[in-house]
Amino acid sequence: MALASDPPKAGFRLSMLIYDTRFRSITIQIVVLLLFLAGLVWLLNNAYVNLEAKGKDFNFSFLWTRAGYDLAQTLIPYSNDDTHFRALIEGLLNTLLVSVLGCILATILGTIIGVLRLSQNWLVARIMTVYVETFRNIPLLLWILLMGTILAETRPVPKDFRLTEAMKAAGEEPKASMWFFDSVAVTNRGTNLPAPAFDHSLGVVDLGWNLPVSLNALAILAVMSASFWGWRRFMARAKAVQEATGTRPTTWWPSLLILFAPISALLYGLGFHLDYPQITKFDFTGGFQMLHSFTALLIALTLYTAAFIAEIVRAGIQAISRGQTEAAYALGLRPGRTMSLVILPQALRVIVPPLISQFLNLTKNSSLAIAVSYMDLRGTLGGITLNQTGRELECMLLMMLIYLTISLTISSLMNLYNKSIKLKER
């Protein structure tokens, strides 16, 4: 209830949008937003007018037309009679494959190098420093080209692995030999590796859109998941017993039994074995071949990104108070156990945020795969499909949207992990 002595409230005036500090910030934000929207509309209209002048329209119907080109490495069934959309999916899967493997390998290698950079051994520390400074100060594209050239030019041709009857009679050996008990052959065409095979099959289920999935693989995945869940329950129970009685029960052999006995029994029942590559007259048959384009890209991405991750790990370790190390030594922990149980767990809070940026950089840097003819998203959608259809704007926008989605997904997952390891405070 207003009192008679209260001063009358001034009414709203348009001048208050500029001179009144309560409204000025809102006015500025609205003006900036309107200018941004006006600029966006102008750009879109300009693109539409230019496309119309060239007799083009803006649509994505080209994705459902026949692709007409083959891909050397595919993770799902694909032929040149499939659509450009399926080629896009294949390129996306290839991108995700090299990105996920690259992030895992670069993290492992970078962590090792980061720890070794702090080694008390002068030679080891200097070697790691040379590695870091060398790899992170040379452009990634050059490393990719170098790895591709080394693999293509220094490895023997497949026929050099063949042992002919004349060579047997003369007691000669082939010019090249396989590695790891004659199971791996690295040629100038690719790396031939043993492939998993089964004597018995549970069948194949079609998920639709020509995506067959082996029931053997689903059964293996289900058993592994159940074993892992059972092991987690067992370890939780062991921890509860330790907290209640002060004595920790034996866990190593039950853990091995829970984790490996079920999957071993399943693999034995399915007749699991390895299909080894065999040399024929001109090339290898059996097993599977990993193309050098994929190998060169993966090695280059791993070594390059690991150099940056090593510096992040080193900085994270140095951020931990030296008193933590001294306290661990006082408790009788050895240096290795101190690093794994005391220092690194605390350093993760410092390491993870910049590590997210390196994962994002590696994923985006994988678009350089076209340099060694690896058919990722850039090679399919942004390469052959773009050239065949002439849909430059649509292809570029799609690629930008896909890479944005991948990056936001990685960032969200890593932020969730970072939140889970944060120091819990009241």
UniProtKB/Swiss-Prot annotation:
Q: Where in the cell is it found?
A: Cell inner membrane
Q: Which SUPFAM superfamilies match?
A: MetI-like (SSF161098)
State the annotated membrane topology for this chain: Multi-pass membrane protein
Which GO CC annotations does the UniProt entry carry? ATP-binding cassette (ABC) transporter complex
Q: Which residues form the ABC transmembrane type-1 domain?
A: 92-414
One Gene Ontology BP term is: amino acid transport
Keywords noted in UniProt: Amino-acid transport, Cell inner membrane, Cell membrane, Membrane, Transmembrane, Transmembrane helix, Transport
A Pfam family of this chain: BPD_transp_1
Q: InterPro entries from the entry? A: AA_ABC_transptr_permease_3TM, ArtM/GltK/GlnP/TcyL/YhdX-like, MetI-like, MetI-like_sf
Record keywords: Membrane included?
yes
Against Gene3D superfamilies, the record matches this protein to: MetI-like
Q: What does this protein do?
A: Part of a binding-protein-dependent transport system for glutamate, glutamine, aspartate and asparagine. Probably responsible for the translocation of the substrate across the membrane.
Q: Partners and quaternary state?
A: BztB and BztC form a heterodimer which can form a membrane complex with a homodimer of BztD.
Similarity comment: Belongs to the binding-protein-dependent transport system permease family. HisMQ subfamily.
Q: What is this protein called?
A: Glutamate/glutamine/aspartate/asparagine transport system permease protein BztB
